[in-house]
């Protein structure tokens, strides 16, 4: 059976809304319009306007309302049309949702999911293309999820909705329409559990979200050059499955990290720091990070491609750590 990422997310929300009457969806155009990307299609008809709530165009307003509802014991799912717009709600996310459980001595929980597309799509320019994975991962009190496959989107969304802590659920606009094989029943997937998509012996490639597709393509290309790659899909950025990364590096002795976001203070830099501390003696080459260029993402299609990680960038990085003649 195949389903799209869009359908996987919808199924997860529907199942949890049926299971727990405290779960509700709130955001711009999630009800009457059925979601900017049709992720919430059909939920209004099934659950009504008290549990699928359209809002004015004010992320600061509806995010704050949802955080308050979570403090009161409900389980909101907040849809941002894009995480670029979530900057308007940053205060509520960082200073209220992420901090209150700690500051209340554990007396006040905040079971809330903030979800929506993150990163580049296709020619939506600099203000709609930013990648916030590293930004949210930097904040104590937030859990950060960035899946690739439909099964992982559903399984991790089930876990996110049931979690008593705020979860940043980072999707990708381009992936919404992608279809994947899925089992008949998808169970909740625990956080902090990476997936090894391919085992290998020469080099470890670590990535997440839509960059998994790029890495899968490159792994097949490099196989023709007798470079055997191990590919790890992180799925959860925070908490991070450090053990899977370290064990893989101990086996392959080389590491390349791929992320769409910027290099400086990025996810890749954090992983590299951990590996240097925990597995330095196992490394046969310096760690390579393939990332987006340190520029606002251009609108022009030719420049947009140059600013994003490419297959050639990854191939070059892998061959470099393998001391392969390029």
From Swiss-Prot:
It catalyses: N(6)-[(R)-lipoyl]-L-lysyl-[protein] + pyruvate + H(+) = N(6)-[(R)-S(8)-acetyldihydrolipoyl]-L-lysyl-[protein] + CO2. The keyword Oxidoreductase applies. Keywords: Oxidoreductase, Pyruvate, Thiamine pyrophosphate. GO terms for molecular function: pyruvate dehydrogenase (acetyl-transferring) activity. Its EC number is 1.2.4.1. It comes from the Bacteria. The keyword Glycoprotein does not apply. Its cofactor is thiamine diphosphate. InterPro entries: PDHB_mito-type, THDP-binding, Transketo_C/PFOR_II, Transketolase-like_Pyr-bd, Transketolase_C. It is an enzyme of class 1 (oxidoreductase). Thiamine diphosphate binds at residue 59. One of its GO terms (biological process) is pyruvate decarboxylation to acetyl-CoA. NCBIfam families: PRK09212.1 (NF006667), PRK11892.1 (NF008854). Heterodimer of an alpha and a beta chain. The pyruvate dehydrogenase complex catalyzes the overall conversion of pyruvate to acetyl-CoA and CO(2). It contains multiple copies of three enzymatic components: pyruvate dehydrogenase (E1), dihydrolipoamide acetyltransferase (E2) and lipoamide dehydrogenase (E3). This is Pyruvate dehydrogenase E1 component subunit beta. It comes from Rickettsia prowazekii (strain Madrid E).
